[in-house]
C-alpha cells in the first residue's frame, strides 16, 4: 500500500472516530490495531471489557469500505451492537434466528448491494454452505471474530461451533482476520492464532487492569443477610449477582424482591421470552438487579453496571475477570464483591475429581486452584489477577479490600526460605499439598517411598499449621517467586526472582494468614469530579424519557460518562456539544437539541 494512501486512511480513521463515534482520541492500543487492520494484516486483540475492542474493527470497517462480517456468539450481543451503530448513523445489520424470512432477505440484499457496512452473525449460520456461497459474491473487506477465546478448548468458554471457523482461512486467504477477546492467557492466545489460521498477526495485548473496579471479598457468615445489607448499601445502582445454580438464583431473587428490591432471576431454564424481558428491562434501567447464572452477561453491553456480586466462587479466574468486567464499562467507579466460603472451593474440587481424568481435567484443576489462590490472597488482589494473566506488576493498587484494610505483616524471610528450599529439594516436581506435607514432616507412605523423609528440609516447618504454609506458598506465587507448572500436575517451580530470597540476601514481608471478614464498603457516594449533580440528575431523566420514546436502552442515547461531562461543561452550542466525549455528528443531530435546551434552562434558572 502506498505511503500516501496509508496516511490518508489514518486521517480518515481519526475523522470516523470523532465524527461518527464522538471520541476525541483513541484509547491506548486502538490506533496501532486499526492501522494494522487497514494495512490488510491479521490481528489478535486482547483487551479488557470496556477497553474499546469494538472500535478496533468498527473504525477500519468504515474507512476501508466493503462489508465487514463480525462473528458474535449471542443474539442479544448482536442486537445491542447494531442498535448502537445505527444510533451513530452506521449502516449495520445482523442475521439471526429471531428474524422473519423477509427480514433476513432484506439484510442479505443490503449486503449484496453494498449498503450494509457491518454484518453481525453467529458462527453456526456463517459456516452454512449456502451462506458461504453468498459471502463469496459480496465485497468482503474484513472478518472479525468476537469472543475469540471460545475457539480454544484451553479457554474458559469453549464453544464447538467456533471450532469450524478455522476452515474460513482456506476459503478466503486474502481477507484480513481480526480476533478479539477480553480474556486469553498465553496458551489460549496461541490456540486462537493456530485454530483461526491467522497469518503473521499483530498480537496486541492491552493491560488487563480495570483501575475503576474495586475488588472486594467477604467471607460468608450469614450470606443472605450479608447480601441484603450489601445491596441496600448500593442505593438503587444497577448490579448483577451471580450464583452457581438455578435454584439459588431463584431463591436469591425472591428474597431480594421480598425486601422491596427491584430484582429478577435469569437462567437458561427460563422461557426465552421471560429471559428477553428481564434483559430488556435491565438494559433500559427499569430493573435494578439481575440475579443470574453465567448464562447472563456475555450479551450485556450496559455501561452503567455499578456492582457485580459473585455469591458463589467461579470455577476459574477467566470467568471471574470476564463477569466482573461487566461492571463499570463507562470507566466510572464500580465494585466487584466476591462472597467466599472455603467449603465452596472444596465442593468444586470434589465435582472436578468426579470428571474423567485427562488433560482437560488438569487444565480445569489448575484454573480452579488459581481462583482459590485469588480468594485466599494476602496481597493486593489486583496484583494476583494481573500476574495470573502474565502482566507483572509490583505496586499494590490501593483499591481492593487487601489494600484498603491490609492484613498484618511479619518478617517472612525465614518462612520463605524454608518453603523455597523444600520445593528445590524435592526437585521442583511436586504440587503444593505434597510440599506442605514434607515441610510439616508428615509420616505417610508416599513421602517414605520417595525418600523425602531423609531430606534435611523434612519437618522444618512442623511448628506451623498446614493453612499457614499454604498461605506462605500462595503468597510466594503471587510475588512471582514460584510458578505452578500445569503440564506437571501444577508442580511448584522456582523463578529467577527466588534466588536472592533463597540465599537470604533480600528482606521479605509476608502477610499473617487471617480469616477475611470485611463489612461491605459502599462505593463512594458520587463519581467525583467537579460537575453539577443536579444537572446530571436532570440529564438522566431526559435521557430516560427519550430512550423510552425511541424504544432503545438509555445508554444508546448517551452513557453516564457523557452526561457527567455535559454536567461539568454545560455545553450550549453545537460546537461545544461535539467536544463532549460520546457525542458524534449523528447523535448531535438526533438528540442534541433537547439536551442543549435543558442545559440552557438549567444555567438560566428557568427550570426551577
Regions found by a protein language model. Name each.
Residues 1-13, 363-365, 394-608:
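Accessory DNA-binding and partner-docking regions appended to nucleic-acid-acting proteins
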Residues 3-7, 11-20, 24-28, 32-44, ...:
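Helicase motor core with emphasis on the C-terminal RecA-like subdomain
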Residues 173, 235, 378, 428, ...:
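Flexible coil/turn residues that form the inter-helical turn or adjacent wing/linker of helix-turn-helix
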Residues 360-389:
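Short, charged low-complexity linear segments at domain edges
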Amino acid at each position: 500500500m502506498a505511503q500516501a494512501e496509508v496516511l490518508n486512511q489514518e486521517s480518515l480513521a481519526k475523522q470516523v472516530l470523532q465524527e461518527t463515534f464522538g471520541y476525541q482520541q483513541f484509547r491506548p492500543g486502538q490506533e496501532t490495531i486499526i492501522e494494522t487492520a487497514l494495512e490488510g494484516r491479521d490481528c489478535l486483540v486482547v483487551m479488557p471489557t470496556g477497553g474499546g475492542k469494538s472500535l478496533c474493527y468498527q473504525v477500519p470497517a468504515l474507512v476501508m469500505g466493503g462489508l465487514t462480517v463480525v462473528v458474535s456468539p449471542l443474539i442479544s450481543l448482536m442486537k445491542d451492537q447494531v442498535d448502537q451503530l445505527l444510533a451513530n448513523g452506521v449502516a449495520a445489520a445482523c442475521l439471526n434466528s429471531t428474524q422473519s424470512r423477509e427480514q433476513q432477505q432484506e439484510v442479505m440484499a443490503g449486503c449484496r448491494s453494498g449498503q450494509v457496512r457491518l454484518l453481525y452473525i453467529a458462527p453456526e449460520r456463517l459456516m452454512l454452505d449456502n451462506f458461504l456461497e453468498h459471502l463469496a459474491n459480496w465485497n468482503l473487506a474484513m472478518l472479525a471474530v468476537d469472543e475469540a477465546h471460545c475457539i480454544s478448548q484451553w479457554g474458559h468458554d469453549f464453544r464447538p461451533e467456533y471450532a469450524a471457523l478455522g476452515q474460513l482461512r482456506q476459503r478466503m486467504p486474502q481477507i484480513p482476520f481480526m480476533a478479539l477477546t477480553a480474556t486469553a492467557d498465553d496458551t489460549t492466545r496461541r490456540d486462537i492464532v493456530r485454530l483461526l489460521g491467522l497469518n503473521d498477526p499483530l498480537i496486541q495485548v492491552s493491560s488487563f487492569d480495570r483501575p475503576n473496579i474495586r475488588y472486594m471479598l467477604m467471607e460468608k457468615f450469614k450470606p443472605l443477610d450479608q447480601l441484603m445489607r450489601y445491596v441496600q448499601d448500593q442505593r438503587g445502582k444497577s448490579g448483577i449477582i451471580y450464583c452457581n445454580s438455578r435454584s439459588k438464583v431463584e431463591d436469591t431473587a425472591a428474597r431480594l424482591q421480598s425486601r422491596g428490591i427491584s430484582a429478577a432471576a435469569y437462567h437458561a431454564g427460563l422461557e426465552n421470552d421471560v429471559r428477553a424481558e428481564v434483559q430488556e428491562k435491565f438494559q433500559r434501567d427499569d430493573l435494578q438487579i439481575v440475579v443470574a447464572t453465567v448464562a447472563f452477561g456475555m450479551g450485556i453491553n450496559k455501561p452503567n453496571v455499578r456492582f457485580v456480586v459473585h455469591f458463589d466462587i467461579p470455577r476459574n479466574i477467566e470467568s471471574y475477570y470476564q463477569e466482573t468486567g461487566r461492571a463499570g464499562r463507562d470507566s466510572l467507579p464500580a465494585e466487584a464483591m466476591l462472597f467466599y466460603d472455603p467449603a465452596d472451593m472444596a465442593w468444586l474440587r470434589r465435582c472436578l475429581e468426579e470428571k474423567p481424568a485427562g488433560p482437560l481435567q488438569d487444565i480445569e484443576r489448575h484454573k480452579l486452584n488459581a481462583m482459590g489462590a485469588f480468594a485466599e490472597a494476602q496481597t493486593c488482589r489486583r496484583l494476583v489477577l494481573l500476574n495470573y494473566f502474565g502482566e507483572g506488576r509490583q505496586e499494590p493498587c490501593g483499591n481492593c479490600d487487601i489494600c484498603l484494610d491490609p492484613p498484618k505483616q511479619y518478617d517472612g524471610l525465614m518462612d520463605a526460605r524454608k518453603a523455597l528450599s523444600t520445593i528445590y529439594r524435592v526437585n521442583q516436581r511436586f504440587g503444593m499439598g505434597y510440599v506442605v506435607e514434607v515441610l510439616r514432616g508428615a509420616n505417610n507412605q508416599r513421602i517414605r517411598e520417595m525418600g523425602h523423609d531423609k531430606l534435611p528440609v523434612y519437618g522444618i516447618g512442623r511448628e506451623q499449621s498446614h493453612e499457614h504454609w499454604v498461605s506462605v506458598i500462595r503468597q510466594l506465587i503471587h510475588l512471582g517467586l514460584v510458578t505452578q507448572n500445569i503440564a506437571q500436575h501444577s508442580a511448584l517451580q522456582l523463578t529467577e526472582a527466588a534466588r536472592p530470597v533463597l540465599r537470604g540476601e533480600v528482606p521479605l514481608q509476608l502477610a499473617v494468614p487471617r480469616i477475611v471478614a470485611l463489612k461491605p464498603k459502599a462505593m463512594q457516594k458520587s463519581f467525583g469530579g467537579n460537575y453539577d449533580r443536579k444537572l446530571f440528575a436532570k440529564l438522566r431523566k431526559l435521557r430516560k424519557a427519550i430512550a423510552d420514546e425511541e424504544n432503545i436502552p438509555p445508554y444508546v442515547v448517551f452513557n453516564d460518562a457523557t452526561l457527567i461531562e455535559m454536567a461539568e461543561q454545560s455545553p450550549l452550542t453545537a460546537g461545544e456539544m461535539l467536544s463532549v466525549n460520546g457525542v458524534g455528528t449523528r447523535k448531535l443531530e438526533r438528540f442534541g437539541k433537547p439536551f442543549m435546551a435543558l442545559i440552557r434552562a438549567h444555567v438560566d434558572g428557568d427550570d426551577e
